[in-house]
Amino acid sequence: MHPLTDTRWPGVLLWVALYTSDYWCTLTCARMYRGGVQHVVAFEGSYELTPYYQKDVDALRWMSPRFVVALVASVSVLVALWSVSRQEAASAYAFGLGALVLVEAAVHVRHVRNLYIFKRILAHDGVSGRIEYARSFALGLSGLELLGFAFAYLAAWLAEPNAFLAGGVVGCLSLGAQHMLRARGGTRSAGVAPQ
């Protein structure tokens, strides 16, 4: 018995906490970026990589209708997967939960790193100079990082096969591939105008 996948609410509550934390961490880093980080590290376009959230993040909107809609929709999908997994496909919920939660785990590693780097930049502690990221470079880097997590989850799945880890592999592969494809179609400009 596994408490995260054998009952519905622990996994759903974990997902809500991670998804909410992701949005708030993004806004915190975006605020730090505008508060001075952009003079040392400049990103082409929006700080946010996900087009769906760019307007809300650019406006530093703490309560976003888009976020609420996406959260309600994703919780509804998890509840539906739970119902299906009890009736027909026993591993559907664990797979879906893994796809959501393990992608968020990868994203949270990025948030922790950015919070550390941005705090050091704002404190003028250990970082000097200026670097500019074209949008295509930022997307490619994100894609590679997500593919790295997919392979780490795959290694864990090879040691202990289960639907939760399989979901994490597929979720990270999918999002990583999307970012890589968007990077290939993106601009490759050298100069980046800070926001």
Give residue ranges: language-model regions.
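Hydrophobic alpha-helical segments at protein termini of multi-pass membrane proteins
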Residues: 1-195
